[in-house]
Amino acid sequence: MNYVLELKNKRFIQADKKNKGGGITMNSKVDVTVTHLDTLIKQLSSIQEFWQREHKLFTGLLVSVHYNKIAAKSNRISGLFKGIHSNDAVVGAKFNDDKSKHIITYFLEDKDLTNSIELLFQVRVILNEVYTGRMSKNILENAEKVNSNIFKNYPISMSVFKSVIADVSYIESFQVHQPKLIKSQSIVTLYDVKKDIKELLEEIGLDPLHVTILDDQTIYLTDTQVQVLFENAAYLVAMATVDVSQLPPDEFIDTYESYRITIPEPTIEPTIGVIDTLFDERVYFSEWVEYHDMVSNDIEKSSLDYNHGTAVSSIIVDGPRLNPWLDDGCGRFRVRHFGVAVGKSFSSYTIIKNIKKIIANNNDIKVWNISLGSSYEINDNFISVEAATLDRIQFEEDVIFVVAGTNKSSEDVIKIGAPADSINSVVVNAVTKEGLSTAYTRRGPVLSFFAKPDVSYYGGSKDAYIQVCEPNGVQSVAGTSYASPWIARKLSYLIDILGLQKEVAKALLIDSARGWEENLDPNVLAIYGHGIVPIHINDIIQTKEDEIKFLVSDISEKWNTYNYGSLSNVGVFTLRVFFGTNHMYGWCHSFCSKVEYVL
């Protein structure tokens, strides 16, 4: 076996950008016609009249552009609205119902709308008089048919004409977004209209002192406050989610094995943070757990509220002894356990508030396990508030969350639930002992293109349950809740014991799961993530005799944008050496491309 190598003290050097970008590109599948221009002019005029009639609570206006495809950044508006700076005015983006088209919301000044209507009129005149009312991509790119001489007698230049034509070729319609009313307490995200949220709430008719503000655009409202918001300014709502979440059910065998287990006292072992339901301090490993009850004393607690949280912490502390077939070679870990929920229902707002406080006050812990999740599916168009909060915390506090992929509450539930849509977290789905997807597993992706879950691990099934310690003894259970703690153990070993950066540790973990699989089927990726993480830590930090794996990391201070692929500041390179040749075949996970090295 070969150990993984980490290469240091060599900065990344940014290559010069060879491709300076293309010019104006029209949609090749659409001809722009006078009829379509007339429709868009009418729609923008109606929107202008709407905002003139409306008692606006802010300076400016909101317009949602329905594109006729999934619009790349280069295909979005660059002639209308604010011209080449229009992307800076984007305040919201989502998909249509069948996820085949983009709907992008812009925050504009009144003059932007007036100028856009005038531009469309001027383009219409030229299109009708010079090009018989129709423009195709072939004609637009023909210098003999579209040149500056033609525009000498018109108020707009050739470049403006081509920009607007290109814009219109990707636009289906203009609208003002009006969401459906949610009749319950909710977490609501408002569009950024460049106004202080407290002033905005007062204009809406809500007392800021009686509204819980989560951040600059997100608020927690009671059902009555939601009603007031939707009556007075529904167009401000970018996203609204019901606050009460339900914990998806776990599978378990309703029998306990009650026998005495002993465990040595903790010494210098690393500490993993656990945010879960309550913890029972009477269990055999309680000396390894520092427990903090965050649930209000006004909330009634039952004995069942201690089962889930205690079980999760038992895996982190002593999982390999309870499950010898899952001995990962990582040893034992201490736990700082924060009980933030009881029963099967909990408030998302309360969880968010507690997590912010917990992480801020416990910055000595780098790895955190969250096995709580919603029984509801994630929104196709938005990252959940819970996930967005985790993403922000991980960036600001230099920590990493391991999040359970959530279980099915019924056969109708297919997609993962919040906060398993967290982009920065390591999201873990469960597999059986044979490495197959379980009956309770839910699937990604997130926003149609973010690969979630990240990885899979053994979470138990009817063929082989996971053994945990609950208050009444050893219990046989199954669920994604019991897969994620094993990954938290491995990450803590890589970060707290080996001293790797969290980004490098995450990349190494994904690399170990992915193996030499170059192109994963999207359906496989949506269920298993990049693959099943090896059981033993040595299979992550070591490679086979014919492989060399090395890590490189740095901060990417500049970047180039490509149509396909992505760049990051971490690379995990695996080289397979073929003896007797002068080539090494290389594969870079999970943030780079395949490479071949010549000796």
PLM regions with names:
Residues 341-418, 476-478, 482-483:
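Substrate-binding/access-modulating region of protease and related hydrolase catalytic domains
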Residues 2-264:
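Autoinhibitory propeptides
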Residues 585-597:
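Short coil-to-beta strand junction motifs in C2/discoidin
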Residues 261-293, 299-348, 396-398, 422-424, ...:
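Subtilisin-like serine protease catalytic core
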Residues 276-278, 284, 415-492:
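Extracellular S/T/G-rich loop segment that most often corresponds to the catalytic His/Ser-adjacent loop
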Residues 498-570:
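C-terminal subdomain of the subtilisin-like protease fold in secreted/lumenal serine endopeptidases
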Residues 23-49, 54-55, 70-81, 159-163, ...:
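Subtilisin-like peptidase catalytic core
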Residues 569-588:
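A short beta-strand element within beta-rich, extracytoplasmic domains
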